[in-house]
Amino acid sequence: MKQLFLLAAVICFGMAILKAYTAWMSTSRAEPNKGYLTLTPEAAKTRLEENPDAILLDVRTQEEYDGGHIPGAVCFPNEDIQPELPLPFEKDAEILVYCRSGRRSAEAAGKLADMGCTNVADFGGIQNWPYETTTD
């Protein structure tokens, strides 16, 4: 009977750890060998609230940016992120990157990491951003 109780306790403990790990992985995870984090929009919003000095990069075109963007974002098109060009921010700054759907932001985050930026996070596309946007 003691063995059955011990087995049940171990299984319950293991399930609790697995649930906590799954929740942690769904909010942020390091992309292996990519040098940047992938965040949910909710985790990105929390980071922006906790660090008002974080740089929010919209890597879409200027026209897309003008059509609506996240408040506080800076338009820095993915095509303009080139290794031979200087960056307009420090490489150790917290940088959060987004685009329309997530493809360009992942590419931009990878390029920024390759250029030596050490605190880059990609949270995908504005189409998944459930919070306020602006055209200002």
What does each model-found stretch correspond to?
Residues K2-E50, A54, E63-E94, R100-D136:
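Rhodanese-like catalytic fold shared by cysteine-dependent sulfurtransferases
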